Regions:
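Extended alpha-helical, oligomerization-prone segments that build pores/tubes and scaffolds
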Residues: 1-332
Length: 332
């Protein structure tokens, strides 16, 4: 409430919480270690333990891991896409791990494990000229389609009029008692590729493991969804209360530090000269009475309100588990 021109401070306690958690995650960057299931697997496990770190390093997974943790801390869910990229290593192909935008992913409502979803869709807006360059048969067939996806609110104007929505559709079929992962890529009504139309892939499927190539990493899980909630959801109420109390304290401080006066209408005091602290003389008309001008008293703020603010900040630290970091302690 109050004047729309009032100062509206926004403190960074919630941001500081997320920064601290992200730093902890990067300090604890995982290294893959493959353990054998039986003694005969020991050699293969040791070989994989040496190969996987190199694979992840070549894929710059540390950068992907950092991006995913930002998403996980803020929105409560990070999604990794694990694909086979035929263009890597000069056409030999290699594994590619990407951090996915959950706004571009769609699955069956109500499932907690995406592998139980009947279908899974991954969407992306791609410039039309890029699509025509790769698939010349799309010339003249691309336009503004009816499908829309959620987008972030950008400071800049992002023009998507010359872009088309490309959909990667994953679904399962049964073949000889085995679950087969099928894949279809299309834009509008134009199918760009489908495993069921490929004789070499129809029986085998897109990937041998038969699973959707997406891994959901949830911070605080919720029922009925593979996503969860993050520290923004957990601490935004306390952050809002801290900012409101900061605003009230700051308004009181500014009111006390900015002198204001009651002036009688017939007090005959030159207000402009009185308000100008650089002028040593102030003109008046007639006798200047004690009640001609009087300062406006601003009640001093009781220390209990500052204590409530500090307690609210401490509550956020405790809620987010950041108390040890803020006080210089260690968790060990």
């Amino acid at each position: 409430g109050g004047n729309p021109e009032d100062v509206r401070p926004a403190s960074g306690w919630l941001v500081n919480c997320i920064l601290s958690k992200h730093a902890d995650a990067m300090d604890c960057y995982p290294e893959p270690t493959v353990l054998p299931r039986e003694p005969g697997d020991r050699q293969e496990a040791e070989t994989l333990s040496r190969i996987l770190p190199v694979l992840l390093k070549n894929d710059r997974f540390r950068r992907t891991y950092s991006k995913a943790w930002w998403d996980k801390l803020k929105s409560g869910c990070a999604v990794y896409g694990v694909f086979w990229d035929n263009e890597k290593l000069h056409g030999l192909g290699d594994v590619s791990i990407r951090s996915m935008d959950v706004l571009n992913l769609f699955w069956e409502p109500g499932v907690t494990d995406i592998q139980e979803s009947e279908h899974f869709f991954c969407t992306e807006l791609v410039p039309n000229n890029h699509l025509v360059r790769r698939w010349p048969e799309l010339e003249g067939k691309l336009g503004r389609g009816g499908a829309q996806v959620s987008r972030y609110l950008f400071d800049d104007k992002v023009d998507t009029s010359e872009q088309s929505l490309v959909v990667d559709w994953y679904y399962h079929t049964e073949r000889e008692g085995r679950q087969v992962l099928q894949y279809c890529k299309f834009v509008g009504e134009n199918v760009l590729y489908a495993t069921e139309n490929d004789p070499e892939m129809a029986a085998r499927g897109w990937y041998d493991h038969g699973k959707y190539p997406f891994v959901f990493d949830t911070l605080f899980p919720e029922e009925g969804t593979p996503c969860g909630y993050g520290y923004v959801d957990l601490c935004k109420s306390a952050q809002k209360q801290i900012d409101l109390m900061n605003q009230a304290i700051l308004k009181n401080t500014l009111a006390a530090a900015t002198p204001r006066f009651f002036i009688r209408a017939d007090g005959a005091v030159n207000e402009n000269e009185y308000a100008d602290w650089t002028r040593p003389f102030v003109h008046t008309n007639g006798n200047l009475g004690a009640d001609s001008i009087a300062p406006i008293r601003v009640p001093a703020l009781d220390s209990v309100y500052v204590a409530v603010l500090q307690n609210k900040i401490a509550e956020m630290k405790e809620t987010a588990g950041n108390r040890d970091v803020m006080s210089g302690g260690t968790a060990g």
